[in-house]
Each structure stands twice: as C-alpha cells, then as structure tokens.
Amino acid sequence: MAQTDQTSPTRVPAEQAAAPALRRGVGRDAVVGGICGTVVVLMVGASYAAVPFYNWFCRATGFNGTTQVATSAPTSAPLARRIAVRFDTNVAGGLPWKFEAEKTEIEVAIGEVVTVYYTVTNQSARTTMAQAAYNVTPLTSGVYFQKINCFCFTEQTMAPGETREMPVVFYVDPAITADHENDSLKTITLSYTFYPVREAPKPVAAGEPDKPRGNL
C-alpha cells in the first residue's frame, strides 16, 4: 500500500516574505523623491530665467511703460507736433543719495534728439552703489520713448560726498503719430528711481606699515 507523503510545506519567514515589498516601496520612494527634486530645480531655474526674460519682454514691447533703447538717432527731420516731457526723480529708502533733474519739464518736437541732465550726490560718508529703474507714463507711450544714452543702463558707484552730472539722450519716435491711441497725448512723464545694489567693496588699505612677525 502506498504511503502518503506527510511532509509539511516549507514556511518562508515573514521577514523574507516582506523583503520584496519593502524593496519595491523603497524604489518607489526614490523615484518620487527624484521627480520632486527635479521639479524643484526646474522651478528655481525658471524663476531666475523669468527675470531677464521679463526685462527683455518689457524692452521689446514697451510693456509697463518700459522705454526703448535706440542705437542711433532718427534719420528723418523732427515733426511739427510737439509734446511735453516731465522728469520725475526718486530714491529708494536706505540709499543716501540726492537725485534731481536740472529741469522738471521741457517741450520737444517728435523725432528731435534731446539731452537732459540729472544731478546725483552721495550724502553719506561711504562709497555706495545703485542703479536706476525707469518707466514712462502713460504706459502706451513706452514703446515710442527711445533712449540713445542713459545712466540707467549701468550701475553707478559714488564716492563719499561725490556729486555727479548724469546725461540722458532720447527722442520720441515719430511712429507715435500713427498710433491713434496716442492722438490726444500731450505729456509724457519719465520716472527714475535709484535702488541700492550692494555694499561697495572697501578699498585695500595703502601705506600701512607691515605688522611685526615673530619675536624681535
């Protein structure tokens, strides 16, 4: 008579049975973590890229009253139509500068190249650095306000107590006369605000005697 196999089935320890599931869970966590890390890096990169892109977009379109940068003067003669240009000056809090336009308002012919001057004084006892942000109002005129030269293109470093005269060369593009949205425009206001950039580097001390080294 054949004997029945009474051998009990082999039991796998619980730790071994759980190991594959645990490894799968760890793998999923690693993938999710990697995806999240990549998203964070992309978001940070996008935030930095957005600043220069926004500045380029404003310059290209005149959006938000941003003026344009001209490489040369217009080739045609100025038009008979004239327009007033007002100059608004501001200094951000914490920047010890005095900033004024030599004239608060002038009248120019459309297409006429004009040079105006601003005076800036560093009223502190330390060297400071700043750069001017700018726009024009009404905002629709920004695309037609062309600057050939401006102190706002670069950072400005002022020594303690220094006063400097800063020119701006500009013209109002004759193309504004074809924009019927500006048919009734009588005045453009050019606004500047100086913002501190960072602490200027301290000059290396000159003429200081060498400190003694070791025992005499």
Swiss-Prot record:
Residues 51-216 are periplasmic. It is a single-pass type II membrane protein. It holds the Pfam family CtaG_Cox11. Disulfide bonds: none annotated. The chain crosses the membrane at residues 28-50. It comes from the Bacteria. It is found in: Cell inner membrane. PANTHER family: CYTOCHROME C OXIDASE ASSEMBLY PROTEIN COX11, MITOCHONDRIAL-RELATED (PTHR21320:SF3), CYTOCHROME C OXIDASE ASSEMBLY PROTEIN COX11-RELATED (PTHR21320). This is Cytochrome c oxidase assembly protein CtaG. The lineage of its organism: Bacteria, Pseudomonadati, Pseudomonadota, Alphaproteobacteria, Hyphomicrobiales.
